């Protein structure tokens, strides 16, 4: 992810006010000019529903490339976390994740964005919120389901 304009920022914003502790983050990026590369970092905390820069806009003639980012939910409650690209007030959502207590988000150039459980395991499942009632076809009425069979594949 590269920020190449003086109006480009990578931001974090939460979906609600925190309960006890703001989320903490650590960011590492390279700043490029036409002749140099300077490794840089940013450490901080969120500010509830107010956006905070993970990587601030580069100054004129420079570019910033995100190398690594770690965001940790150190609050006592679950929270929605949005990472967004701010191009001079034009927002593009990069990632939205609901983090449970002690879960984390990590970004690396090699792996992209990943979410980890409180135990450090990669969170790979997703859930679909279903409506409170589902209309089933008429042919699937009472008595239509007569047997449940479990099949194991050896492939």
Residue ranges and their predicted role:
Residues 1-155:
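Surface-exposed, low-hydrophobicity beta-strand/loop segments enriched in small/polar/acidic residues
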């Amino acid at each position: 992810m590269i920020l190449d304009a003086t109006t480009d920022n990578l931001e974090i914003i939460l979906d609600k006010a925190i309960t006890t502790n703001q989320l903490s983050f650590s960011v590492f990026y390279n700043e490029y000019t036409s002749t140099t590369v300077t490794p840089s970092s940013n450490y901080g905390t969120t500010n509830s529903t107010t956006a905070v820069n993970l990587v601030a806009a580069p100054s004129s003639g420079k570019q910033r490339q995100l190398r690594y980012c770690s965001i940790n939910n150190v609050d006592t409650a679950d929270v929605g976390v949005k990472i967004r690209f701010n191009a001079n007030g034009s927002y593009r959502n990069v990632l939205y994740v609901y983090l449970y207590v002690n879960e984390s988000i990590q970004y690396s150039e090699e792996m992209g964005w990943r979410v980890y459980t409180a135990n450090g395991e990669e969170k790979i499942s997703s859930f679909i919120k279903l409506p409170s009632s589902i209309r089933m076809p008429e042919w699937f009425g009472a008595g239509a389901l007569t047997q449940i069979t479990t099949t194991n594949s050896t492939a």
